[in-house]
Each structure stands twice: as C-alpha cells, then as structure tokens.
Amino acid sequence: MFPGGRYFTVVCAFSHRNNDDPIMHSRHPGLSHNHTYAGNRSVDAFSTSASLRSGSTTCDFPQDASGYWAPTLYMGREPIQPMAVLVYYVKRTTADVVPFPADLEIVAGDATARKAQRKSIVSWGCDGFGGSKRYALIPACAKERTLDLRVQFPNCWNGKTSDSPDHKSHMAYSTGGKCPASHPVAVPTMLLILLYLPVPEAAQVVSGRFGAHADFMNGWDQDTFSTFVAGLNY
C-alpha cells in the first residue's frame, strides 16, 4: 500500500523554470531542456548543495532548501505549471535508514527513453497519488481528477561518493527490502509527485513522451534531516 513504509512528507510549491541543470550540465547555463523547479527558489546552472542552503524555499519546511526539478510539461508551446509538488521520504528497507550525505545529487528516470520506463520508477496517474492505476504515458484524466507524475528515487547508497559520472551509479534500488552489496547503505526512498490539472493526451514533457525523470540536489539542514530520518526507524 502506498507509500510502502514509514514516511514523512514535504509539500512544495512551484518555484521557477529555466534551461539549466546543475547536475547534468553544471556551470553551463542554457544548455539543458526546460526544467520546472520546486523547493529552492534560486536553482540555476551554478548551484551546489552549499549554495542551496543559503537560499530560500517554497517547501513547507524552511529547513529543506533542496532543489527538486523535472522536465517541464507542455501543451503545444505553453508550459504547464504544477499545482503542488509532494515529496514522500519513505523507509522501504529492513535495515535502518540513514540521512543522505550533505552534498548528494541524484537523477531518477531516463530523459533519453524512447519506450516505456519501469512504472515503479516513472509513471503517470489520475488520482494525485497513492494506489491509483499507473500509466507509462500521460493519461486522459477526467476534469474532476488530478494528473500526477510520480518519480521514485533509489534508496541504496554506495557509502562513498555523493555523485557519479552518470549521476546514477552511486545509487541503487533495493530489492525485497534489501540493498545490494555494491550499495550497502540504506537511505530513505524519495517519491517525488508533481500534481497538475488534467491536460489533453497530446501534452508531453519537453524531454519526450517517454522521457519523464527528476533530479534532486540536497539542500536540507542536515541536523533537521537527520532527526526526521531517525524517526523512520521506530
């Protein structure tokens, strides 16, 4: 049952859009496709975890100045702004979870995908969140429903590096509540959920109809985050 374990939730508003990506194209402004940001208000191509912590946030916890972003959803040439962004931090391992390293950067999902991604990682739905039917492509939601994009981040860390050349291989997904030997450190699963008003099926994210994904750059106050994460183990 969603979300699949003990959890705490951060609720964030839309912040801004730009053509930057401080993880994939660090220090190269304008090189990325358009991104929609929530959380930290100042994310750009030059952002780092340290710089984020000195900024402000759209999230309901002021101690969370992290950057959360995803490719912008478009209907034709019109960008569509999410109504809200939810971030579930969930314990999904049998081992206790520990906080992320202070400068962790993660990408989940594949911007270059040209076929359906695993729906356990990237999916769309019409119920906003929870156990609704999941789709590989944007569904035609009824007017009274809420379209959502859900991206699940990996929850096992190699314990050594806060990033990697592909921005993914320092992390892995658990299987049956167990982390692989290559990534033995259990951390919370992040479920990033972007909520939208229903859109026509012709709408798509700028990275392509199958290319939904999301990025995270840690900007938490580490003492606060450590306290929240410790609570997931009891």
Task: Give the location of each predicted region.
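Primary mode marks residue(s) on the alpha4-beta5-alpha5 output face of response regulator receiver
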Residues: 1-32, 36-151, 158-234
